[in-house]
């Protein structure tokens, strides 16, 4: 965007080793098939997000897989002092519980990556999370030793994200979102962002969107004055979902959101129902017609027939989007959603996804 030519590095070799940064225990090694799958998935995701013209993708297997042990020790090992390596935070924090030679040498491999990209591609700046500082500086030192102290080589680290409550933002802290729609659907992705805390939302607008400073300041003011409208959260969810899943993914996510909120779910497809109610309470039922009271009790949506009758009569029960107030009503599993599901809503938005067997 600013005239620079970014290079995205895929860890075809380092992914098979495992980075010890930020970990208290040894990583479990992945199989060759898992590493290959991750390489392909990451490459496809980057192309989808950024296109194919504005950046370059490199895989460190291009050079590291050709490096034999003797050359590794002679050409690079001699340039690293063990006492300096031990003093790196990532290693020092692991010494008490132990660290394998494999993970101990990871920083050398990442240093070689920076050296090759600097020498062959002219890459001058490496960007990574704050836990990568030691690995990045190891690369800068290696470049200066091999190419001279005047060789331009720089590192920039980005602080690991923390939520307002102090917990980490990421998969290790739970509740992570993925770029792959097979792992996090567009609806789940949209919901993740729209449910962000008022204390975090402005920060995320700055991190994850391309909105102007004026637009973000306006949304910050709205959040302060009218937090119940959640204008900033809605804009954040729209911008990030559109960037990752495209206009079609955003529209689908909003359609599912609106349908579940209003209760008008008739027009949702089976796939959209599965997206929207993936994390809702679930139950199973047979494919035969059944009295609504018996159906509610058999699926454990209601604790008793008395409670079921009361809720039905009071208009608290909806079957596939329709309010049913007759205790004589029969639930027909084949009537909607291709006979795969019956959707029960109790009250305003308490959904249960009943799978038909």
Residue ranges and their predicted role:
Residues 20-36:
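A charged helix-plus-loop insertion that forms the helical arch/lid used to bind
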């Amino acid at each position: 965007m600013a005239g620079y030519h970014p290079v995205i590095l895929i860890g075809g070799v380092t992914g098979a080793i495992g980075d010890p940064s930020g970990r208290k225990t040894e990583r479990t090694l992945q199989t060759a098939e898992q590493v290959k799958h991750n390489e392909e998935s990451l490459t496809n995701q980057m192309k989808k997000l950024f296109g194919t013209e504005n950046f370059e993708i490199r895989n460190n297997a291009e050079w590291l897989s050709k490096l034999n042990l003797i050359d590794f020790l002679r050409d690079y090992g001699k340039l690293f002092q063990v006492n300096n390596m031990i003093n790196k935070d990532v290693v020092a924090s692991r010494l008490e519980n132990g660290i394998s030679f494999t993970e101990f040498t990871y920083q050398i491999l990442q240093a070689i990556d920076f050296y090759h990209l600097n020498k062959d591609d002219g890459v001058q700046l490496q960007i990574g999370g704050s836990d990568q500082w030691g690995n990045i500086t190891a690369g800068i030192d290696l470049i200066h030793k091999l190419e001279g102290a005047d060789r331009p080589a720089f590192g920039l680290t980005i602080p690991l994200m923390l939520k307002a409550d102090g917990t980490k933002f990421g998969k290790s802290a739970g509740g992570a979102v993925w770029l792959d729609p097979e792992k996090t659907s567009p609806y789940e992705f949209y919901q993740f962002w729209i449910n962000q805390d008022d204390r975090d939302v402005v920060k995320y607008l700055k991190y994850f969107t391309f909105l102007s400073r004026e637009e973000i300041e306006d949304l910050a003011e709205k959040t302060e004055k009218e937090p119940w409208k959640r204008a900033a959260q809605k804009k954040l969810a729209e911008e990030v979902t559109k960037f990752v899943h495209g206009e079609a993914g955003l529209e689908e996510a909003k359609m599912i959101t609106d349908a579940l909120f209003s209760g008008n779910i008739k027009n949702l497809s089976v796939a959209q129902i599965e997206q929207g109610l993936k994390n809702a309470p679930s139950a199973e039922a047979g494919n035969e017609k059944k009295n609504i009271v018996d159906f509610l009790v058999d699926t454990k949506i209601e604790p008793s027939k008395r409670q079921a009758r009361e809720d039905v009569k009071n208009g608290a029960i909806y079957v596939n989007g329709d309010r049913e107030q007759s205790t004589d009503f029969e639930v027909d599993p084949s009537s909607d959603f291709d006979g795969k599901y019956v959707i029960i809503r109790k009250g305003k938005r308490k959904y249960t996804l009943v799978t038909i067997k």
